[in-house]
Amino acid sequence: MIDQFERLPGIGPRTAQRLALHLLRQPEDQIRAFADALLAARSQVGQCQTCFHLSAEPLCDICRDGKRCDQLLCVVADSRDLLALERTREYKGRYHVLGGLISPMDGIGPDMLQIPSLIQRVDRDGISEVILALTPSVEGDTTSLYLARLLKPFTQVSRIAYGLPVGSELEYADEVTLTRALEGRRAMQ
């Protein structure tokens, strides 16, 4: 059981051991309920037909929300990124989940992601702006540049700003982060 927990992202050997020992101390009905919940989630949760976010319905809650701005489309790598943006309660547009990032080293090319459906959606739905919200990494930058080149004939393309986290000290920031913070600067209001 410990080996299975260690396969989960963010779970190391000590946490895996704690989880396993905790479960072994639980009553059998709670363990069965936990196992049933895992199996139910696996069989009932799929992808939204429009944005590819996780959903138990053909359309996710965001795609069904009539109050969302249909002209803005935020592109994210996966549902975790979408949920992080939703926690801000600032973005009111639609989303498109790629299902990963272009990574030749890992054997992931553009054809393995939800890029063709993104192009179709932008063209079909008359999106006025696509916001690329991809991680500031080699893979994220590669994917952003690739998408920007494909999307510019159809619509305006922007990328979220990157810089220093709130509460951080300049002296501890690396050069790339500082460069991006300077490039993404805005006028004081």
Curated annotation (Swiss-Prot):
GO-annotated molecular function: DNA binding; zinc ion binding
C4-type zinc finger locations on the chain: 48-63
SS bond list: none
Keywords: DNA damage, DNA recombination, DNA repair, Metal-binding, Zinc, Zinc-finger
Domain spans labelled Toprim: 71-165
GO BP annotations listed: DNA recombination; DNA repair
InterPro entries from the UniProt entry: DNA_Rcmb_RecR, Rcmb_RecR, Rcmb_RecR_Znf, TOPRIM_dom, TOPRIM_RecR
Family matches, as HAMAP family: RecR (MF_00017)
The family this protein is said to belong to: Belongs to the RecR family.
Function: May play a role in DNA repair. It seems to be involved in an RecBC-independent recombinational process of DNA repair. It may act with RecF and RecO.
Stated name of the protein: Recombination protein RecR
Organism ancestry: Bacteria, Bacillati, Cyanobacteriota, Cyanophyceae, Synechococcales
Encoding gene, per UniProt annotation: recR
